[in-house]
Swiss-Prot record:
SUPFAM superfamilies in alphabetical order: Blood coagulation inhibitor (disintegrin), Metalloproteases ('zincins'), catalytic domain
pH effect summary: The heterodimer of A and B subunits is structurally stable between pH 5-8 in the presence of Ca(2+) and Zn(2+) ions. Stability decreases significantly in the presence of imidazole and glycine. Addition at nanomolar concentrations of glycosaminoglycans (GAGs), such as chondroitin sulfate, dermatan sulfate or hyaluronic acid to the buffer, increases its stability.
Annotated source species: Vipera ammodytes ammodytes (Western sand viper)
GO cellular component entries: extracellular region; plasma membrane
Keyword Disulfide bond in annotation: yes
Protein name (record): Zinc metalloproteinase-disintegrin-like protein H4 subunit A
Amino acid sequence: MIQPLLVVTCLVVFPYQVSSIILESGNVNDYEVVYPQKVTSLPKGAVQQPEQKYEDTMQYEFKVNGEPVVLHLEKNKGLFSEDYSETHYSPDGREITTNPPVEDHCYYHGHIQNEADSTASISACNGLKGHFKLQGETYLIEPLKIPESEAHAVYKYENIEKEDEAPKMCGVTETNWESDEPIRKASQLVATSEQRRNIQKYIELVIVVDNVMFRKYTGNSTAIRTRIYEIVNTLNVVFRNVHIFVALVGIEIWNKKDQIKVKSAESVTLDLFGDWREKDLLRRKRHDNAQLLTGIDLNEQTLGIAPMSGMCKPKSSVGLIQDYCKSYLLVAIVMAHELGHNLGMDHDDGNCICREMPCIMSPEAGSKPAFYFSDCSWNQYQKFRNDIKSKCIDNKPLKTDIVSPAFCGNYFVEEGEECDCGFPGNCRNPCCNATTCKLTPGSECGDGECCDQCRIQTAGTECRPAWDECDVPEYCTGQSAECPTDVLQRNGQPCKNNNGYCYNGVCPILTNQCISLFGSSVTVAPDRCFNNNLQGTENFHCGMENGRYIKCKPQDKKCGRLFCVEPPTGGGINCKSIRSEGDPDHGMVDLGTKCADGKVCNSNRQCVDVNTAY
């Protein structure tokens, strides 16, 4: 093992306690002044790349509560996608999109040396700013604004004065997840080598900033970008525990005016934002999920809202987050919570536990920040990711898609690496040498769906079963540890005895959608129930345009709200439908559903010829 050579230029850090100060995170009652000293940490023979402004790895030493600590930092590789873009608007309303260079950024993850379960999320752009975990406590660090000084403030999260003691909560109130799997203990949330196959997921995220937030930061786009980068850097600390990486693919700032009506009524704004994403943003920017950061106060102490299991759906893969406090950390935790809803996670109840309470999916913001998902959330997420509709987060970035220089220990296999299982103290993969990111002697592979006990599986071994008759199975080639690219039956191919047509790997039919919503006793309602969709109201419609609900045309009525009926028991029929405040697509007919012979519902909720729909 290569031992790093540590050279400390100055070990005297002069900490002292101060009673109260106003910092970027707010009014802090008790903090410590420290002077972090950079420690040179280069393996013997290593050479620092001169063209880099920000090193791939750094170490700083300072004191906390009188005890020296060493903060290890490694650059967050993959924080930005290769096609990262920023969009704002000209005075006449034109979109202006740029692709700024982000290769040599200043955002890091890390840990405290010799501290179990320690994590850190730090920006090193102008001094050290961020948070770290030490002995079970969350500390924040930020530079003090003293000219010609390296002084920083270090303080516990609990010492930040709360601006408003009223309970803050999530706006998702209607959830109906039911478990058909045993709840796993928190200690079981570490994946085994078998479970790691096909478990890593990737969310390509766009964050949109509304006009009120733009004005809240006095039009300072640099400050807004910095806040967003800090939020996404923290998201990756949180989601690493459930094997998800969040890559920022774009920022859009509504600097001139909002592109939708942003209202305090969170469910209305969420619905409008989802509609805008589907009809505007998705058509010009590839991404998996979009979150709207707003500067307005949402109703009823709500901090955020997102559709349950909305990830990958054109209209529902969205969230609405209030930029409610000065601390980026707390806003990041709210966004993590709403992304959890997008990934199928319900609110935790009293039976749910996590490594450190409170858990991310608690329905109310607690007195301390949450960093871990519960056992309940893990099970719900497993159920969601086993649904073919979640496949947009499966695509693994190519090695060349990671724009920063390669770094061994960041869990990404990059150019020049054969494997990457994290730092030596965290690596649990017997196939991979964590120090060199090379395979161990005798190993053929380190990970992948076609890697079993460090050996590439033989050709013909099934690595991805067919989910549906509209999917096809994939088999190992015998040459690679990765399962071949997922292949689906063509859209429009007849399925389920000609009762439906294939759409993105599934066979959506009205009968199954009714059973999913109301149980096995229901059937599809007669046509007269679907006539309600001709109204164009909040409950019965064929979508939304410019903030108004669209009346379904008679030929399109089976592409709007879904109607089902119970078995007749005498008397008239009862047209059953369902609507969710938090999920605009919940209870609507699925896209690709057969609406007439030879016709399917398209993304505009029109019943069109199946041969021209795709």
